[in-house]
């Protein structure tokens, strides 16, 4: 990407077609609202709202002692998180100030996924790599360029999700699973997380 060039998500053309108000958000061309912020806030609180959060990053952590290592660099007790569960955590600097927050999704004892904030992808990449075990027992992969992330939030989000992707793709709060076979043929994973205060999902979709 050339310096100063804005990045477009896979849904950019859809946003334009829906006449979204698009702004520069941490180097991405993203919709800030469609009709107006108040209407969309209330729609999410009373029904469901869908958000393109593909500017967020995706890291994959793997290794035989990945839980112990992440527990040593994050505030969450990662060794207590069972497979298929998610947990919120922070990363702190030497003075105890927050560098970034992240939601971990535990795939297995040797694989964990995490989503850094858009403006912190490169910062967290460098910070985490600087703290990797010297024996190379933990590996970090940046999956961000290969992924789109859609947040579906609100009290009617379950009804909407199951009508489109099937009941087998519903997950409970702070649960994680691979996306099962579905009518749209999309693949990736889904977790029962979000930042709106409502129930909902975050879908990480692999680019075809």
Predicted regions and their residues:
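Basic, glycine/lysine-rich polyanion-binding surfaces/domains
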Residues: 1-206
